Regions:
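Alpha-helical transmembrane segments and their membrane-interface boundaries
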Residues: 1-76, 123, 148, 163-168
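Hydrophobic, membrane-inserted alpha-helices
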Residues: 87, 109-117
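Canonical alpha-helical transmembrane segment with a positive-inside/aromatic-interface signature
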Residues: 98-99, 124-168
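Alpha-helical transmembrane segments of multi-pass membrane proteins
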Residues: 25, 51, 55, 59, ...
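Residue-level signal for the membrane-embedded core of alpha-helical transmembrane segments
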Residues: 22, 84, 108, 132-133
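Transmembrane helix-loop junctions at the membrane interface of multipass transporters and ion channels
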Residues: 114-127
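C-terminal ends of transmembrane helices
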Residues: 26-37, 87-100, 144-147
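Short hydrophobic alpha-helical membrane-embedded segments
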Residues: 80, 102-112
Length: 168
């Protein structure tokens, strides 16, 4: 149990958290849907919303059962991480020739959306909003960096020994 933690939240807080979890996970889902990724809008919303609801239920359990000293809201959060790990694992696939793996970003995105939903469920709005912004930074900015690195790597590899000899 979290010693000294205030677990009582109002119905207005609950509604706000559910709506915010839906909105933030929708923002990520729309970006994924736009790029035609396997886990799009609905999947991301379900993961974010579900994580928020599981977190709210665990927090509210302390209000509903005040005499139970062993209720610890963080236990549900730990199980969310495990559950999303299984869901994410289902999105990771080997290419037919087994030369590469696909779906890692999709799995990681679901994991982060679950973290955002859990943070909102706990009332950690700043963390959830900044986390969502960092997802967008990753998709919009870092993906361009990755593409540039891959392009340069391919250019370098295509020159083979000629490039190596030029550097001698």
């Amino acid at each position: 149990m979290l010693e000294g933690a205030v677990t009582h939240i109002t119905e207005a807080d609950i509604v706000l958290r559910i709506i915010l979890a839906t909105v933030l996970s929708s923002v990520v889902g729309i970006e994924r849907e736009y790029h035609q990724k396997p886990a799009g809008l609905r999947t991301n919303v379900m993961v974010g919303l579900g994580s928020c609801l599981f977190t709210l239920v665990s927090i509210r359990a302390a209000d509903i059962f005040p005499d139970m000293k062993a209720i610890d809201p963080t236990r549900i959060a730990a199980q969310i991480v495990t559950g999303i790990g299984f869901l994410g694992a289902g999105t990771i696939l080997f290419e037919k020739d087994r030369s590469s793996v696909i779906g890692l970003t999709t799995a990681a995105t679901l994991w982060v959306v679950a973290a955002v939903g859990t943070a909102i469920g706990m009332g950690l709005y700043l963390e959830a909003i900044v986390g969502t912004l960092m997802v967008f930074f990753t998709f919009l900015v870092l993906s361009k960096v990755v593409n540039e690195v891959r392009k340069r790597s391919t250019d370098h590899a295509s020159h083979g020994d000629t490039a190596m000899e030029a550097n001698k």
